């Protein structure tokens, strides 16, 4: 960890236990665990959501759900986050953590290509986080 990362880490709130557990399980089970957003990025996403106060959020690229859980923590009651993951093998892992989180009721997990799923969701999204295949 370089000096800037250490500084940011020291000033950030501690990682939530559930997110820490998800980080650990992702590193043990996922093929490419480096794709996980992680603690600092998660805190940044939560802060951005709190500042923007969106009612509808779209995330493209769920992976194991860390960023979705982080953003959901920043959502106000009644707001919703739709997250789209193309890899159906990650569905059970991500959903299990959404189900255990106090913010999980704000999250709707969709499995499939974002090119197909996003238009079917309809409506307007106040915030979109693209963390999936950027080439498409």
Spans of model-derived segments:
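Conserved SAM-binding loop and adjacent beta-strand
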Residues: 12-16, 30-43, 50
């Amino acid at each position: 960890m370089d000096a800037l990362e250490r500084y940011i880490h020291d000033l950030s709130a501690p990682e939530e236990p559930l997110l820490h557990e998800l980080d650990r399980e992702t590193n043990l089970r996922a093929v490419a665990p480096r794709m996980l957003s992680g603690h600092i990025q998660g805190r940044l996403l939560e802060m951005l959501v709190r500042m923007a106060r969106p009612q509808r959020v779209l995330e493209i690229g769920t992976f194991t759900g860390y960023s979705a859980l982080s953003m959901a923590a920043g959502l106000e009651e009644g707001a919703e986050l739709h997250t789209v993951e193309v890899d159906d093998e990650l569905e059970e892992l991500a959903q299990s953590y959404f189900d255990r989180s106090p913010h999980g009721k704000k999250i709707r997990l969709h499995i499939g290509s974002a090119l197909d799923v996003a238009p079917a969701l309809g409506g307007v999204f106040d915030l979109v986080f693209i963390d999936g295949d950027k080439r498409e």
